[in-house]
Amino acid sequence: MAQQMSPGQHGSECIHDNAQSHLPPYVDCDSAGFRNNRSNLTLKFSSDFEKAQKAMEFCSDVCAVYFPADLDVVFNSEIENELAVDICEWRFFPCFSESLKRLAISMSRLSSLQIDLSYERRTLLHHHLVWIFLMDEVCERLPLLGLHDTMERKYLENLKNITMDLPIEDLNQYKGICPDDLLQVALDVQRILAEDLMPLKRALLEESHVQKCSETLCLFFDNQYEEGKIFFKRPTTHQIMSTRGYTIGTNMVFLLFLQTPMVDLYNADDPGLVQLSILVALFHDFIGLQKDLDSLKQDCDGSVGLNLVRVSMQESGHDEKEALQTVVRRLNSYCHGLEFFMSAYTPLCKQLYQEILKFVFALYDYHLLGATESSNSRYGWHRVSDYKA
């Protein structure tokens, strides 16, 4: 397990003028940024919308993300470390590949976000985050094997039935057709949902909350199937967008950390929540572009052709840097606009969106830093503290 790092290991940190601000130290820090192993582009964060937008006008090698100043994105290192220990003792942990084990440990950071949530609820959230990566691996590989309309359909139907406590079909009928390792992953995914996630939800959440979780998860499965149909069809941005707000999976994560009053307001088809999920998808595709391009060459993941940044490059004729800056400008404009419109919401609705937006930016942080503020090597980005504009 990664050990907690001391502040000195990151070099000099920026101190915010507002002592009450709980912005991550890389926000509004002129000397801090992130670079990818495969590019000289620098990613920076600013709580000043105009400054972020202008930074990209003056420098083609910078992407400046707007980070709203009133978001409390803080993580609890004690909880993070405890979750990291506990996930290693989870009975399903031995089922994971070495890379997924490392990912599971790093996700303890995301599950330690400073919010009003019991440790048991955090454990459920942590298990779900790990499970969704395992579940998605099956959906990414089956279309490459020509099994989308057969085994994948049955796999997703089984998962839906598990959420509704209905019988499932035995996937072993595909033994000899599907590689043994992938078949075992699919079986493990079903077991974790049936034996761990659903029992935890029923034990920790109110019945109406569990019902919303199941409905949202089934919507996710339905869109996963629809998305699999276009893996090899050179889809347009508009075709991808019709499912991506659901298949990015964040609506389910939102539900797992919300408290009852806000859960009552939650609607998986709420256009605003779908847009926030697209926000996550755009940043995910931004941060994962190089990884997806590598996977495309290796032909090991059918979903990489759906990367919205890559598709926008094909449609617009932009080079990589232009496409990345365009995506970031879109992210910034949406967030800035949302802040304005939220002022007209009811207090509870505003709180719902504020909490979800906080988690969106916690995801940004996780994608870049991973566990204990180190570096999330999954996407090839690393922190640089000596950047000069």
Curated annotation (Swiss-Prot):
UniProt short sequence motif DDxx(x)D/E motif, positions renumbered to this chain: 136-140
SUPFAM superfamilies: Terpenoid synthases (SSF48576)
Effect on the protein of changing residue 288 to S: Reduces the sesquiterpene synthase activity
Binding site for Mg(2+) 3: 284, 288, 292
Motif NDxxSxxxD/E motif per UniProt: ranges: 284-292
Amino-acid positions noted as binding Mg(2+) 1 in the UniProt annotation, renumbered to this chain: 136, 140
UniProt-recorded Gene Ontology molecular function terms: lyase activity; metal ion binding
UniProt remark on domains: Contains several highly conserved motifs that are important for catalytic activity including the aspartate-rich 'DDxx(x)D/E' motif and the 'NDxxSxxxD/E' motif, both of which are involved in complexing Mg(2+) ions to coordinate the binding of the isoprenyl diphosphate substrate in the active site.
This protein's name: (+)-bicyclogermacrene synthase TS4
